[in-house]
Curated annotation (Swiss-Prot):
Biological or metabolic pathway of the protein: Amino-acid biosynthesis; L-tryptophan biosynthesis; L-tryptophan from chorismate: step 2/5
Species this chain originates from: Pseudomonas entomophila (strain L48)
Residues the entry annotates as binding anthranilate 1: G82, N113
Lineage: Bacteria, Pseudomonadati, Pseudomonadota, Gammaproteobacteria, Pseudomonadales
Any one GO CC term of the record: cytosol
Cofactor(s) listed: Mg(2+)
Protein name, entry field: Anthranilate phosphoribosyltransferase
Pfam families from the UniProt entry: Glycos_trans_3N, Glycos_transf_3
Ranges in coiled-coil conformation: none
Major enzyme class: transferase
Length: 349
């Protein structure tokens, strides 16, 4: 199916099949469509609402075209990532959590990008921390296999996305592509925590990942609007495990945490986010640093559970708490900085 035929279908509020969506996405991602066609397609999809078949088709093409990271094993390798777009502008919780997860002995293949709508994306934060981002897939694999953690910069691994960049920027609205990033990890991880900007996406994205072969995934959205587990409100979870999807609410108290306001956790940019994370992963000298630490523990614990590194959510949170207080997570961040600095010298020689 070509994009003109797809537009005719979408105008009539008719869904595309998975194969039809694959055809259209392949045309978009290989530069065969005009910016006007891409913009119209994205807006039409949003107005119609994307079906599970359509998302599966789009994700499968993005995965095919990605510059993949080949790891020695995917057993228990986890990603913790969000769609963004929640408007809260709190510090980089999932990126900070990744270092706690790795310090707990669980392998992390972190996928992320620069900020689109927020103040600090995962790439912005890591760059502020002195971590070199422009790695080849082989270099990323060496980080992950050697240190237990590595970062895959989305724009490096999904270069075909450049064809949709202009229309996405000009539209200035959430589109299909906002939900594709967390579903297209270049290492092909089977364990994830995926935060989404609306509860309505939790079950559908769990079903998408089920169809694409994921093993254990938590798709989450908190009642206060965050695309991650929140200290301030219940969090809705669609959990894929043993090829079954279950849905439930989790209160912070269910996991041994105290409910509290998120006041003081919003940041104006990556440097402010880094300073808060340094406090949270270090001595927690400030009230906000302590609160940030608890937010990190909550989300890192969920990822340890998704990775099957803990038997229950509560056990994952307890393990994350113990690890954070050792200071090993901050050391892991510094290790990654030193490791990638060697690659920077190699790449720029």
């Amino acid at each position: 199916m070509d994009i003109k035929s797809a537009l005719s279908r979408i105008v009539g509020h008719l869904d595309l099949s998975t194969e039809e969506m694959r055809d259209v996405m392949r045309q978009i991602m290989t530069g065969q469509c005009s910016e006007a066609q891409i913009g119209a397609f994205l807006m039409g999809m949003r107005m119609k609402s994307e079906s599970i078949d359509e998302i599966v088709g789009a994700v499968s093409v993005m995965r095919e075209l990605a510059d993949k990271v080949e790891l020695k094993s995917l057993d228990g390798v986890v990603d913790i990532v969000g769609t963004g777009g929640d408007g809260a502008n709190i510090f980089n919780v999932s990126t900070a959590s990744a270092f706690v997860i790795a310090a707990a002995g669980c392998t992390v293949a972190k996928h992320g990008n620069r900020a689109v709508s927020g103040k600090s994306g995962s790439a912005d934060l890591l760059e502020a921390a002195g971590i070199y981002l422009n790695l080849t897939p082989v270099q990323v694999a060496r980080c992950i296999d050697s240190l237990g953690i590595g970062f895959m910069f989305a724009q490096t691994h999904h270069s075909a996305m450049k064809h949709a960049a202009g229309p996405r920027r000009d539209l200035g609205l959430r589109t299909l592509f906002n939900m594709l990033g967390p579903l297209t990890n270049p290492a092909g991880v089977k364990h994830q925590v995926v935060g989404v900007f609306t509860q309505a996406l939790c079950r559908p994205l769990a079903e998408v990942l089920q169809r694409l072969g994921s093993k254990h995934v938590l798709v989450v959205h908190s009642k206060d609007g965050l695309d991650e587990f929140s200290l301030a409100a219940p969090t809705f979870v669609a959990e894929l495990k043993n090829d079954q999807i279950t849905e439930y609410w989790v209160e912070p108290e269910d996991l041994g945490m105290k409910s509290q306001s998120l006041h003081g956790l919003a940041v104006e940019g990556p440097q402010a986010s880094l300073e808060l994370i340094r406090d949270a992963l270090g001595r927690r000298k400030t009230e906000n640093g302590q609160k940030a630490a608890e937010m990190i523990v909550l989300n890192a614990g969920a990822a340890l559970y998704a990775a099957d590194h803990a038997m229950t959510l509560a056990q994952g949170v307890e393990l994350a708490h113990d690890v954070l207080h050792t200071g090993l997570a901050w050391e892991k961040l510094q290790e990654l900085g030193a490791f990638t600095a060697v690659f920077k010298v190699e790449n720029e020689a």
